[in-house]
């Protein structure tokens, strides 16, 4: 079973201004976001990636480029429209402070599976396309590169939250309980019977254990010995 590292783009100019960017063109990383993306890319250098699949929006492409440039080998680079940002419709480009006054805001917060943005996408449709794309890419990468393959998907906060909710077996109505910060790392491995979530919203720490991690089948009763159990003796 391959392993997918879900990376949110670094902080964007819209994040700083408090605007819901959505698919607005020209929204790029700010200086802090660029530094965040570089740090995440450096953190991933210990893992030989086979592919970097990214949303087509500029802030994700910029984050993906830093990851690709930091790799010693040359992972394949793919733009995937199915993991682009949610289509927020008329909400796109609006200040979050004003959107929070809309009646739909409370639906998005407490009952997101029922939320459809005006002249936009429903959160349920967003999750369906995103989860479908991640699972398709994961299966294709495992078929081509084997069960030890590790790849990255660079996407957006709500997209990654919805993928994690699916992997955790959570209803979409609970996905607002998940936090995904800019340039954070979340790690999922899809098994034959269920996904396993290793990490969520991580911005520090060694990831070299991914090079030695044994495939997950049954969950260890009691919690198991952790990542170090898969390391070679003496390491």
Question: Can you name each region flagged by the protein language model?
Answer:
Residues 10, 157, 202:
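Active-site metal-binding loops of divalent metal-dependent hydrolases
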Residues 11-62, 66-67, 116-131:
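Loop-to-helix element that buttresses phosphate recognition and phosphoryl-transfer chemistry
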Residues 126-157:
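GST-like fold's C-terminal all-alpha helical module
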Residues 5, 78-80, 198:
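General small-molecule cofactor/ligand-binding pocket signal
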Residues 104-125, 222-228:
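Short glycine/proline- and acidic residue-enriched helix-loop micro-motifs
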Residues 1-5, 51:
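Extreme N-terminal starter segment of soluble prokaryotic enzymes
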Residues 2, 86-97, 143-149, 166-235:
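Acidic, low-complexity terminal tails and accessory targeting/binding regions
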Residues 38-106, 234-235:
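Phosphate-coordination/substrate-recognition cap region in phosphate-metabolizing enzymes
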């Amino acid at each position: 079973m391959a392993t997918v590292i879900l990376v949110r783009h670094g902080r964007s100019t819209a994040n700083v201004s408090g605007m819901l960017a959505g698919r607005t063109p020209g929204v790029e990383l700010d200086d802090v976001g660029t530094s965040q993306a570089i740090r995440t890319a450096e953190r991933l250098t210990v893992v030989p990636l086979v592919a970097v699949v990214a949303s087509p929006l500029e802030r994700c492409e910029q984050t993906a480029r830093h990851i690709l440039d930091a790799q010693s080998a040359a992972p394949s680079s793919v733009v995937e429209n199915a993991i682009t940002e949610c289509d927020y419709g008329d909400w796109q480009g609006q200040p979050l402070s004003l959107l929070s006054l809309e009646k739909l805001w409370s639906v998005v917060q407490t009952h997101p599976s029922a939320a459809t943005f005006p002249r936009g996408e429903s959160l349920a449709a967003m999750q369906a396309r995103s989860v479908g794309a991640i699972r398709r890419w994961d299966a294709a990468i495992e078929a081509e590169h084997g069960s030890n393959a590790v790849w990255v998907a660079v996407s957006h906060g709500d997209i990654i939250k919805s993928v994690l909710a699916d992997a955790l077996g959570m209803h979409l109505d609970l996905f607002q309980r998940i936090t995904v910060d800019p340039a954070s790392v979340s790690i999922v491995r899809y098994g034959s019977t269920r996904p396993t979530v290793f990490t969520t919203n991580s911005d520090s720490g060694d990831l070299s254990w991914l090079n030695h991690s044994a495939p997950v089948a049954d969950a260890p009763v009691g919690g198991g010995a952790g990542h170090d159990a898969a390391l070679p003796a003496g390491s």
